[in-house]
């Protein structure tokens, strides 16, 4: 049975009429939200951020994380995120021009799903105590996903939106977004500079950085010459070969 991950289903409330009049920055004059790692986000944005999507779901990097201020410390709030398709167009990466270009109308979008932060609901004091990270949010291109992942269309452009909703009054919804978090959903990275920046800045890609063997010189018979690149990688790969040799000796 398909589950409903819409904002109204999550809040167990009926849809609110004229919702656009409720979700406005006029209602947020006391609440402030600041993007963490904004410098990193801008580096990606300047190149044209890409986010990998898979059928099973893939987490975002950079991770969306914000600092919230101006909440009532004793009131309870639900904090959630959805993705807004900001251009109803399909894009492709032009390698000749080194940029993304529109190729025509986009695919129809399903109603936006919400990713509810696992701490919800919580008092304002809790949300303001430390950065709020959405590191567990996953993106999928599976239109039939029933795991609560955010569904997107590949080669389409999206922007995350952070929603802060008072638990006792769901009509008091405050929405924030940041231009530098825009991205294009892809099933494989298109811009090699994005790939390099992801490897450089993602702590989970440390292994790729350490084991990168580009620049290792090969001699005429295919052996390694022991250049600087090999010397830096050897301490990392030696345990593997030592263990392999040990196993071979045991199996003799």
UniProtKB/Swiss-Prot annotation:
Residues in the DNA-binding region annotation: 40-210
Biological process annotations from GO: cell fate specification; muscle cell fate specification; positive regulation of DNA-templated transcription; post-embryonic development; regulation of transcription by RNA polymerase II
UniProt keywords, alphabetically: Developmental protein, DNA-binding, Nucleus, Transcription, Transcription regulation
Effect of residue 68 to N: In cc571; increased number of vulval cells
Gene inactivation effect: Non-striated muscle cell fate specification defects whereby the number of vulval cells is doubled and the number of uterine cells is reduced due to the transformation of uterine cells into vulval cells.
A GO CC term attached to the entry: nucleus
Cell compartments where the protein resides: Nucleus
SUPFAM superfamilies cross-referenced by the UniProt entry: p53-like transcription factors
Name of a matching Pfam family: T-box
Keyword Transcription on entry: yes
GO molecular function: DNA-binding transcription factor activity, RNA polymerase II-specific; RNA polymerase II cis-regulatory region sequence-specific DNA binding
Function: Probable transcription factor required for the cell fate specification of non-striated uterine muscle precursor cells. Furthermore, may function with the transcriptional corepressor unc-37.
Subunit structure: May interact with unc-37.
Name this polypeptide is given: T-box transcription factor mls-1
Organism: Caenorhabditis elegans
Designated gene of the protein: mls-1
């Amino acid at each position: 049975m398909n589950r409903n991950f819409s904002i109204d289903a999550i809040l167990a409330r009926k849809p609110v009429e004229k919702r656009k009049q409720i979700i406005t920055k006029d209602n947020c004059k006391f609440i402030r939200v600041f993007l963490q790692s904004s410098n990193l986000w801008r580096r990606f944005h300047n190149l044209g951020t890409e986010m990998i999507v898979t059928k099973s779901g893939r987490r975002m990097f950079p991770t969306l994380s914000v600092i919230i201020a101006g909440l009532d410390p004793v009131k309870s709030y639900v904090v959630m995120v959805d993705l807004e398709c900001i251009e109803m167009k399909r894009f492709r990466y032009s390698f000749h021009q080194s940029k993304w270009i529109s190729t025509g109308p986009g695919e129809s979008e399903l109603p936006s799903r919400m990713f509810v932060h696992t701490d919800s609901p919580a008092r304002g004091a809790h949300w303001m105590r430390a950065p709020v990270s959405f590191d567990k949010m996953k993106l999928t291109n599976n239109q039939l996903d029933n795991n609560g992942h955010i569904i997107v269309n590949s080669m389409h452009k999206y922007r995350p939106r952070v929603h802060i909703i008072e638990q006792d009054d769901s009509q008091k919804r405050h929405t924030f977004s940041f231009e530098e978090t825009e991205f294009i959903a892809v099933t494989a990275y298109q811009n090699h500079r994005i790939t390099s920046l992801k490897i450089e800045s993602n702590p989970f890609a440390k292994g790729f950085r350490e084991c990168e063997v580009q620049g290792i010189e090969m001699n005429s018979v295919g052996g390694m010459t022991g250049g600087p690149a090999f010397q830096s990688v050897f301490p990392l790969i030696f345990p593997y070969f030592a263990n392999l040799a040990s196993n071979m000796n045991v199996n003799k």
